């Protein structure tokens, strides 16, 4: 067995990007209603799909 350099997946201390600090259970940004409104798109448009 020859000694090999550790690849990125086997590093002892991989340099991972740090996530923003947030208290447990707090959303990162925006409420559920806002997110739903943002992602609903054209579903609630009365003029869509005539």
Curated annotation (Swiss-Prot):
Any one Gene Ontology BP term: sporulation resulting in formation of a cellular spore
Domain of life the protein comes from: Bacteria
Keyword Acetylation appears in the UniProt entry: no
UniProt KW Transmembrane helix keyword: no
Induction info: Expressed only in the forespore compartment of sporulating cells.
InterPro entries listed in its UniProt record: SASP_SspP (IPR012614)
Subcellular location: Spore core
Keywords for the protein's UniProt record, in alphabetical order: Sporulation
Pfam families linked to this entry: SspP
Residue spans of biased composition, Basic residues class: 33-50
Region feature (Disordered): 1-50
HAMAP family cross-referenced by the UniProt entry: SspP (MF_00666)
Family per record: Belongs to the SspP family.
Name of the protein: Small, acid-soluble spore protein P
